[in-house]
Amino acid sequence: IKDYLDFPDFVLEKIKQKTFGEKTIVFFSDLLRVSLLATYGGIWCDASIFLSDKIPLNLRAREFFAFERARNRPSREKLKRIIKSPYFSYGYFNWNEDFMVKMLSSFIIAKSNSHFISALRDILINYWQKEKNIINHYYFVLHVIFELLKKYGYSNNTYKNMSDIECHLLQFYAKNKFDSKLWQEIQQQSFLHKLTHFRTIKKDSMIDKIIIQGIN
């Protein structure tokens, strides 16, 4: 890490002493991704992301970009139809004004030293410098900072009609029996698919056919 980033000493000490909290790796990975992007620019893509197509050139050229919640809440019928995954509750896909977890932090595009990514890095470093409680860390600190920055004039423009719902469509249907028509519909809505860890994978399920067997 020292070869690529000039972190303050307290960050390296927190890693060594595991005082980022119980989820040390998760919390540090948030700081790591925004620090790498602020320093070098590029694309942060978690291992849980599956790309079924190339990342569009006009998206890669953005100063800053992250997928986030659609501004308009889908109908209850649509939510019931698509949110079938056992990994989600209706509470996660929330449109309340005071709800602060609305970004997909597993895929971020940024130019080096862009205002948005630099602000995320600087605030996170300041937060961890002052945070002494090693037990009750809030899991979505990065997401909360993201929403607060938007309230203070930092902008993140959407891409076409894609939101974090479209990015999760394959995960919603992951355990269903493979349906080529459904897979085509999902690909028409999103080139990027946020997945998760699967303890078991049913043969010929959506996730088996697409990820394991490699069907296009």
Regions found by a protein language model. Give the residues of each.
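Small-residue hinge/turn detector
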Residues: D30-G42
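Glycosyltransferase-associated regions of secretory-pathway enzymes
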Residues: I1-S29, A47-N216
